[in-house]
Amino acid sequence: LETSEKIVAAIRPFGVPCVPDLYTGGAKRFVTYNFADDYGTDFADDQPETVVNSMQIHFFMPANESYISWKKKIRKALFDAGFTFPEVIIQTEDENTIRHMIFECSIEE
C-alpha cells in the first residue's frame, strides 16, 4: 500500500471521513492528512533506495468532548500501520469550538 492508503486503512475502523488536504463535508469528526516532507535515503548508484514520507494527520472533533481516548486510539492505529510513533499537537480552533489534533509521523515507502 502507498502511504495515503495506509492512513485511510488505519483510520477506517473509526468510522470517520478521511481525506487528503481539505474536508468539505458536514461530519463533526473527520481526518485530513498531508505530506509535510518527503526525501530519499539509502542512496546507491546516485538513486535513493528508500523514500521517507513525513506526514501530518489531522483529527477534528467538537472541543467540548473528551479527546484522550481518540488520541490514544489514532496514535496506536498509525503506529500499528507502520508509521513511527506519532508526536501529537493539540489545539482548538474556530473560537474554541473545534479541537484539532495533529499527529506527526513518518513512514518509509
Which functions belong to the PLM regions below?
Residues 72-109:
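Acidic-leaning, charged glycine-interspersed low-complexity segments
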Residues 1-44, 70:
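Small/polar-rich, solvent-exposed N-terminal microdomains that initiate assembly or binding
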Residues 25, 47-52, 95-99:
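A generic structural micro-feature
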Residues 44-45, 56-60, 81-85:
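Glycine-rich loops and low-complexity Gly/Arg-rich segments
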Residues 5-15, 50-61:
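N-terminal short leaders/motifs
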Residues 51-63, 99-108:
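Oligomerization/assembly interface segments of phage tail-like spikes and tubes
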Residues 1, 6, 43-49, 86, ...:
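Compositionally biased, intrinsically disordered low-complexity segments enriched in polar/Pro/Gly
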